[in-house]
Amino acid sequence: MKNYLSALKYCYENGDFVKSRAGNVKKAFGYQMRFDLEKGFPAVTTKKLAWKAVVSELLWFLEGSNDERRLAEILYEDDRENLEDKKTIWTQNAKADYWKNKSNFKGDVGKIYGVQWRDFNGVDQIKNLIKGLKESPDSRRHILTAWNPAELDEMSLPPCHAFSQFYLSNNKLSCQLYQRSCDMFLGVPFNIASYSILIHIIAKECGYDVGEFIHSLGDFHIYEEHFEQVKIQLTRDPKKLPAVSYTHLRAHETS
């Protein structure tokens, strides 16, 4: 994960200090990281990664759900006692004051990632993506997007990781993600892991090997409250990348 630490260092040392909507930040614009998934899974090793939260959210997206309480069911699958009191990374959005008048039910987060992936104006993008990769592997149209301008006002949070393209070469599946807004300390390690898992899932479903995850950052930033933690991060040496093992993965129902 040296390339992640390099991006973090660049932002911390070269970013502009500004007051943003969500707090003071150091921010920069435009950066690309590449992760060769054949060489290991790009999990950050210089701090803890919320692995179960990463996997649970991705599965929730793939279900096409807009129910934050459904995410809680997945996340706390082994401990559902007092589930109503347990939080997820989307709880704050579901309960936000600005969202209350738009929410249709308790836990509603609106037409966010999963809804767009599985029902973008009636289009199941995940199903189409897999079908396209199987039937027309050399196509330049293997696109997955959560950015639906017509429905941004119906989302509790507009998509940060907005647009991705999949690419096949030598039987290896790669993905490039464009992320418009990038929280370098908390969000980006989470996003790297999530899309790398997604590549594994889709590659497995299509019968391909994994290639690269390419992460293109738009507005990438470090919040002032994380400055001290970032400085600690930058003193640590990353460990050897872990490997991912699984017995069975499915990206969608084929029936």
Where are these regions (language model features)?
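A contiguous catalytic/ligand-binding core that recognizes phosphate-bearing ligands
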Residues: E63-I197, E205-C206, R250
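An N-terminal structural lobe/cap that precedes and organizes the functional/catalytic core
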Residues: V18-A43
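Conserved small/polar residues in nucleotide/adenosyl-binding loops
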Residues: T247-T254
